[in-house]
UniProtKB/Swiss-Prot annotation:
Its main location: secreted. The keyword Glycoprotein applies. This is Apolipoprotein D. Keywords: Disulfide bond, Glycoprotein, Lipid-binding, Pyrrolidone carboxylic acid, Secreted, Signal, Transport. The gene is Apod. It comes from Rattus norvegicus (Rat).
Length: 189
């Protein structure tokens, strides 16, 4: 009984103190991903336009660059401007985990951490991309991660509305999505 109370108290703490994270009961949903995904067209620079806030991204002006590695995997370079004005960057590696669904990638930033799902739900390769990730904990709750990316620092409102519709039509909660201001950001990729 004491163990159950401790577990419930811990879970309650997670749900109430994790700023921005999107915790939900049940396992991760499995939304459809981009059909006929072409990773080579996806390579290059992307700007973070909107996202569900995550504990590992605290800065602004977030940009990502994807490039092909010699081993066939994808180098991921994320950069952000910290609140104190310094530049923070993290480098990782992504790979296609299932060639029958090439838009389902796994990304790993630190060797001691397991790879995380990185699913491209939608992209036109030239202007927008919708990325979804989810982690299930203890088989009965999950955390959603969402990124709306643009090839330019701005996306038209109708594009953002369309991408949010994809999320909601797949039972992915968008209530905590925030807009990331890319105005007056340095070009650091």
């Amino acid at each position: 009984m004491a163990t159950m109370l401790l577990l419930l108290a811990t879970l309650a703490g997670l749900f109430t103190t994790t700023e921005g994270q999107s915790f939900h009961l049940g396992k991760c949903p499995s939304p459809p991903v981009q059909e006929n995904f072409d990773v080579k067209k996806y390579l290059g620079r992307w700007y973070e336009i909107e996202k569900i806030p995550v504990s590992f991204e605290k800065g602004n002006c977030i940009q990502a660059n994807y490039s092909l590695m010699e081993n066939g995997n994808i180098k991921v370079l994320n950069k952000e401007l910290r609140p104190d004005g310094t530049l923070n960057q993290v480098e990782g590696e992504a790979k296609q985990s299932n060639m029958s669904e090439p838009a389902k990638l796994e990304v790993q930033f630190f060797s001691l951490m397991p790879p995380a799902p990185y699913w491209i739900l939608a992209t036109d390769y030239e202007s927008y991309a919708l990325v979804y990730s989810c982690t299930t904990f203890f088989w009965f709750f999950h955390v959603d991660y969402v990124w709306i990316l643009g090839r330019n620092p701005y996306l038209p409102p109708e594009t953002i509305t369309y991408l949010k519709y994809i999320l909601t039509s797949n039972d992915i909660d968008i209530a905590k999505i925030t807009t990331k201001d890319q105005a007056n950001c340095p070009d650091f990729l």
